[in-house]
Amino acid sequence: MEELCFDNQRIWFDPNLLQEDPKACFDASFWQQQGKVIGSAQGRGTTWFVQGETLPMALRHYRRGGLFGKLIEDAYVFTGWEKTRCAEEVALLSTLAVGGVNVPRPVAARATRHGLVYRADLLVEKIDSAKDLVDLLQQAMLPDHVWYAIGRTVRKMHDLQVCHTDLNAHNILVDSRELVWLIDFDKCYTQEGEAWKAKNLSRLHRSFVKEQGKRNIHFSATSWQVLCQGYELPDN
């Protein structure tokens, strides 16, 4: 990653992935004016999907959730550039990618300081042909080898001592090759020890049960059993 420092901003970017102007690429209007917006998704604000010169990307502005987010929508206390949410997520994604976990490649990040607080943006690779696991499970039951692959992917993440604080079915993608991807590592971190891993896995199980009741997804005790086999057993 290269780094730009100017005025009240810090920008990190990968010159091999980003051919556009790093100072302009975090504004949705920049992409709209070029006709390069290829989609969007709603969550905490809008995630814009844009077509860059080298690859499709997802552009996200960091926003708070919950009650506090209604009071202070997108400002965070500044304690150092490397401790900003965007810088930490870029570092974590890089660690996971090097460790063999399928995650979006970080393209660029920007932190803008305003006195005691800052705001942040992130640009990551958009995974080609990948779909939200919940969307897929609403349509049909997945074959066992995909459930197994989900378990293996989570295990690889845990073996790198990375705790995904929002590990749920929506943050798992499956592409057209049936490769499993993990996304949305905001507020995630590395953690020593082993005890937390079972709790993290239980969190994922609760999300499947929740979506089964809410959206009637195709999920069963057998599905979870195969996922756990993938988590517990070594690769063949």
UniProtKB/Swiss-Prot annotation:
GO terms for molecular function: ATP binding; kinase activity; phosphotransferase activity, alcohol group as acceptor. It catalyses: an alpha-Kdo-(2->6)-lipid IVA + ATP = a 4-O-phospho-alpha-Kdo-(2->6)-lipid IVA + ADP + H(+). NCBIfam families: PRK01723.1. Catalyzes the ATP-dependent phosphorylation of the 3-deoxy-D-manno-octulosonic acid (Kdo) residue in Kdo-lipid IV(A) at the 4-OH position. Belongs to the protein kinase superfamily. KdkA/RfaP family. It comes from the Bacteria. The active site is at 166. This is 3-deoxy-D-manno-octulosonic acid kinase. It is a peripheral membrane protein. One of its GO terms (biological process) is lipopolysaccharide core region biosynthetic process. It is found in: Cell inner membrane. The keyword Transferase applies. The gene is kdkA. Keywords: ATP-binding, Cell inner membrane, Cell membrane, Kinase, Lipopolysaccharide biosynthesis, Membrane, Nucleotide-binding, Transferase. The lineage of its organism: Bacteria, Pseudomonadati, Pseudomonadota, Gammaproteobacteria, Vibrionales. Pfam families: Kdo. GO terms for cellular component: plasma membrane. Its main location: membrane. Pathway: Bacterial outer membrane biogenesis; LPS core biosynthesis. Its EC number is 2.7.1.166. InterPro entries: KDO_kinase, Kinase-like_dom_sf. HAMAP family: KDO_kinase (MF_00521).
